[in-house]
Swiss-Prot record:
Pfam families: Anticodon_1, tRNA-synt_1, tRNA-synt_1_2. Transmembrane segments: none annotated. Keywords: Aminoacyl-tRNA synthetase, ATP-binding, Cytoplasm, Ligase, Nucleotide-binding, Protein biosynthesis. GO terms for cellular component: cytosol. The lineage of its organism: Bacteria, Pseudomonadati, Spirochaetota, Spirochaetia, Leptospirales. Belongs to the class-I aminoacyl-tRNA synthetase family. It catalyses: tRNA(Leu) + L-leucine + ATP = L-leucyl-tRNA(Leu) + AMP + diphosphate. GO terms for molecular function: aminoacyl-tRNA deacylase activity; ATP binding; leucine-tRNA ligase activity. Its EC number is 6.1.1.4. One of its GO terms (biological process) is leucyl-tRNA aminoacylation. This is Leucine--tRNA ligase. Its main location: cytoplasm. InterPro entries: aa-tRNA-synth_I_CS, aa-tRNA-synth_Ia, Leu-tRNA-ligase, Leu_tRNA-synth_edit, M/V/L/I-tRNA-synth_anticd-bd, Rossmann-like_a/b/a_fold, tRNAsynth_Ia_anticodon-bd, Val/Leu/Ile-tRNA-synth_edit.
Amino acid sequence: MQYPFQEVESFWQKFWEENKSFQTNIRSSKPKFYCLDMFPYPSGAGLHVGHPEGYTATDILSRFKRMKGFEVLHPMGWDAFGLPAERYAMQTGIHPAITTKNNIDNFRRQIQMIGLSYDWSRELSTTDPDYYKFTQWIFIQLYQSWFNPELKKAESIETLIQRFSNKGSADLDYKPFSAQEWKQFSLVEKEKILSDFRLVYQAEIPVNWCEALGTVLANEEVEEWIDKGYEVVRKPMRQYMMRITAYADRLLEDLKLVQWPSSTLEMQKNWIGKSEGLEITFPFKKPLKSGSDGIRIFTTRPDTIFGVTYMVVAPEHPIVSEITTPEQKQKVEEYQKVSSLKSDLDRMELTKEKTGVFTGSFVLNPANPSKEIPIWISDYVLYGYGTGAIMAVPAHDQRDYEFAKTFGLEILPVIEGEITDVAFDSKTSICIHSSSSEISIDGLDYSSASSKIISWAESKRIGKKKTQFKLRDWLFARQRYWGEPIPLVHYPSGITKPIPESELPLELPPNLEEFKPSGTGESPLALAKEWLQYKDPETGEIGTRETNTMPQWAGSCWYYLRYIDPKNGKLFCDPDLEKKWMPVDLYVGGAEHAVLHLLYSRFWHKFLYDIGVVSTQEPFAKLIHQGLILGEDKRKMSKSLGNVINPDDVIRKYGADSLRLFEMFMGPLEMVKPWSTRGVEGVFRFLNRVWRLFHTGEGESFRLDEIEPTTEELKILHKTIQKVGEDIPNFSFNTAISQLMIFVNEFTPSDRRPKEVLETFILLLAPFAPHIAEELWKRSGNNKSLSTEKFPEADPQYLVESEILIVVQVNGKLRDEFKAPKDVSEADAISIAKNLDKIKGILDGKTIRKEIYVPGKLINLVIG
């Protein structure tokens, strides 16, 4: 008899939906388990078989936890803002809201076909105004806050205003002004100062501009779009930024609070990129008209300062125009133009040939003022990282070495060691050639020399010890229509203010007919003339709304909180419910989000923690990345390769339980695995064997016998209970399924069908293959759904083996084995071994020189 999967799966999916089987009792007194998938972007292509891998894993664990007595929160929603829907609208004229809704409907249909136990009453979409009302609310809180470096936390901007009123900028790393001066500043002057502290601010910066997309890209997004074939160039624009760098230390330090894959922790650490060293000013040889006294650089190797032979400034550094001599102006401007067309990714490519141009100007080495240092520009230095300038020590830095060799610049060793065709950058050797009338560090090691240089620079007030981060502030504006409107208004007076919170959500203008970027660097919202105009409710002043929208990452920064309380119209989440359910106990999703979504959401969560609206420092306690599922050709699934497998086709032919079981049986969850249609067929055959185990005869009637199980049958059962019960929480789904298969293989040949044993087996199968399990449970006479049943507990008495297997070696080579009582004595074990037929034949006529016995495991007979 073949398992009628289509009929069974259709029935139970409808049953679960109608009975709301998986709705969370959010105020339950049971222990909680919050199990979350990274919600998908609903693309037009729909799901492929790679998507259900992570969803199935979390579903198995969610079902298991319910059976273990937990109240489980397992929701699903849609990260639905983004470029693809808008680009489709530009091509077809169909509004992004329409295509997004259609895509969501298709994704939901596909996900429901898999039989996943989501609480659909909590479904959300980042494009829903009722949702992004609170995305905008969080944005306003960020805008109205600053990061207090003394307390290392965010505070209301009002506390900063009060501070300025009381003591000016004292005790802050900022240009000095007194309390009296603050009070005399105009509103615009005050706002300019406050914007230097706000967690959301505007800045004129070189951005990653994609002409084809008509928008800027965050640093973290560039590689993805270049890989898709888009050209990304650097272009100066005024953009909204989020001051994520203020949280760099906490983002790094608090990684110790989470249980995440070591590779992801390492990626975040590297992206944040903490380094300690010296920030020091190299004075100009000739004073500039602007009065600037020199160029600041940051170095992690103060001990090599005597080895500086040139300086490199980023081509886009504002100082370049001032320091370029008339003779070098044309070359410098040509180089600036060429470098502006390159992305940061291109510029940081280590293997590319070094290029650059001399500016014609010099600085002096502060540690050795008689040493003139030529100033060059080169695109391997980025203005957005550090100070935008470096001291070049070619003897002890590989990139500097390659640049110096290219342009014939001096290479001066100041650390003991041999320079061949690579720079020598040891931290274990001592300093040489490092002495002047200012200071000497000759003979000192790295640590001592660095400390001495830093102390000297601080005493001279030309430098200071500093901690620096590779992390840069988050470019938060996009020149697109399909994103959350930024709830700010710009007024002719020069002031920018958020709209009142009572007016949230600020919705997108629905009747916009043109979705293409304006071509001026503004978003299509600039074309919505009526929507643009805003009258300040307090002053009556007419302002213009901000036309940029938020990036796709905004909505995903906090969605895990909204699932807890999705219908609350007043708060993004009830405080008591947040305290009960946070943090997320398990978060599953792709490793590609390690330095995007995961970093951004941690940043927002820490801010929300600072302002007292969440109770945990980290949002996700445990994180797992599922491995990619490749095509059958072992290449990444892609339309262009024609190797995409649609789950609809698999479910239509083999059923959802087959898809679920196979994806979990392919191998460890985190591994990359190729798809195999033959593998699905094998799992489908297994489910049919399970079905036949419970059915018998030509009439295919259901059969379970009210008979006492044998001891052997109970041993098989309880061994399976223990194995499956241990493997599920450890995500060892493949070995758990293997044990279920062993169980079926043990029982299939027998004509016995003990109800106690086989009913328990159904409970073990349920998290993996819920449709067939529900059907078998119902047919065995149970009226309630499996979702309310308890997971079986293994009985220790059936896990104890009464016999042990002992192997027999002769001269160290395996010759035979036998079973013996667990408490067999050494003498009896050796006697049994000697009397085995194989062993007797080998020993015939030989002398046993030694008998070695490893209790309960091994006997080795040494013969001569």
